[in-house]
């Protein structure tokens, strides 16, 4: 395994590519669950498999855009029976000189020239409808104005959000085919970690078991298990070897000390190392490997470093597994100077202000306080940047 220190953008793209590659491989080899069909409520937040076509037009008929009267020809108009929303469209034609009261959304009868708004006309003493405010607008929504029959509503790989589900429902969709959520396992390594209470000197509190599954779920994965692993080479190898999930996320053990066994364990179980460290700090000693139908995302043990690695690589990795496109990063403008006198990218949690992005306080690889109230992460290249410079941000999945 040759160590190649990847720039963070390249590592992010590689994680996405490897997720997509595994998804394609498992589909071809029929490994694991295939796409599932869910009703719209159950499919919210899931990823569409294949293009979603509209089974019906929106609206499905020529309809009134306002409450008022459907009219034909010039007024005054003779009034006919009212038409209300929910009424079955009639073939009875509206002839010139006639009008019918109509409610918003109701189908306009054939022959309608326009809908006169209720505030623009009135019925005179003789019972005729008379317009008192001129208007050139028709106030009629033509069938298919919003969505045409058979139109692609959303392309495959799109996440079904509530507004998208609402539009799908409006066009007559009842259920959709979605990608199965990739299963994930979290393994927290370290003899010094305790699961509850205030840690004693020499111990640290487990901050990952409660949080990493939620972050993975926000990416679209399905965490199925978490476990604690001792700083033991055999134990580490056994845990990695036994995993059958699509994604295994580990924390700790990726550096080079005598108690760091992840790299050796990956080699021992025959995993292929795909990303061997990333040129950022915090988070440099993160690893990505694959064996068979399982990807291993191995993060540093320091809390901020692990969170940086999970956001930088974990999100793109799950997106690739689900067939989603890689989310673009965009740019934010710095409100202050940010020095970086070391090689590689400096990742900082930041707050958005009217003047631009301001790095949060209390930031080291071991601190979470700066991340707790952050609006996102930003990456400052070697040499630093000055106020007014644009830098790439990375969205936090919980914001």
Stretches with model-predicted labels:
Residues 101-103, 131, 155, 186-189, ...:
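Short beta-strand segments
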Residues 62-64, 89-95, 108-109, 122-123, ...:
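Solvent-exposed alpha-helices and their adjacent loops that cap or buttress functional pockets
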Residues 139-250:
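Phosphate-binding glycine-rich loops and their immediate beta-loop-alpha structural context
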Residues 1-17, 212-220, 247, 263-267:
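N-terminal intrinsically disordered, low-complexity, charge/repeat-rich segments that act as generic
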């Amino acid at each position: 395994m040759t160590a190649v220190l990847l720039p963070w953008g390249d590592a992010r793209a590689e994680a996405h590519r490897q997720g997509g590659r595994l998804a394609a491989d498992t589909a071809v080899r029929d490994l694991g669950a295939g796409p599932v069909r869910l009703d719209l409520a159950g499919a919210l937040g899931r990823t569409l498999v294949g293009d979603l076509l509209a089974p019906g037009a929106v609206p499905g008929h020529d309809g009134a855009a306002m409450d008022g009267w459907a009219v034909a020809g010039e007024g005054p108009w003779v009034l006919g029976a009212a038409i209300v929303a929910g009424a079955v469209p009639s073939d009875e034609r509206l002839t010139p000189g006639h009008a019918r009261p109509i409610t918003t959304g109701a189908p306009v009868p054939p022959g309608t020239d326009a809908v006169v708004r209720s505030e623009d006309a009135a019925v005179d003493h003789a019972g005729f409808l008379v317009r008192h405010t001129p208007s050139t607008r028709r106030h009629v929504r033509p069938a298919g104005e919003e969505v045409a029959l058979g139109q692609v509503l959303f392309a495959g790989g799109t996440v079904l959000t509530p507004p998208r589900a609402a539009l799908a429902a409006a066009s007559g969709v009842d259920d959709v085919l979605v990608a199965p959520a990739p299963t994930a396992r979290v393994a927290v390594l370290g003899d010094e970690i305790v699961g509850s209470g205030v840690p004693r000197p020499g111990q640290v509190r487990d901050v990952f078991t409660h949080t990493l599954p939620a972050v993975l779920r926000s990416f679209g994965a399905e965490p199925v298990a978490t476990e604690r692993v001792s700083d033991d080479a055999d134990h580490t190898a056994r845990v990695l070897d036994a995993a059958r999930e699509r994604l295994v996320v580990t924390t700790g053990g990726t550096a080079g000390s005598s108690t760091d066994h992840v790299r050796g364990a990956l080699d021992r179980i025959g995993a292929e190392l795909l990303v061997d460290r990333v040129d950022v700090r915090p988070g440099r000693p993160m690893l990505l490997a694959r064996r068979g139908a399982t990807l291993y995302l191995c993060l540093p043990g320091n809390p901020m470093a692990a969170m940086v690695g999970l956001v930088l690589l974990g999100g793109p990795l799950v997106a690739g597994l689900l067939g989603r496109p890689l989310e673009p990063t965009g740019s934010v403008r710095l409100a202050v100077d940010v020095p970086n006198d070391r090689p590689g990218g400096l990742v900082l949690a930041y707050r958005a202000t009217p003047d631009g992005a301001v790095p949060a306080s209390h930031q080291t690889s071991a601190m979470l306080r700066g991340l707790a109230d952050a609006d996102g992460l930003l990456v400052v290249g070697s040499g630093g940047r000055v106020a007014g410079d644009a830098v790439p941000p990375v969205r936090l999945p919980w914001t």
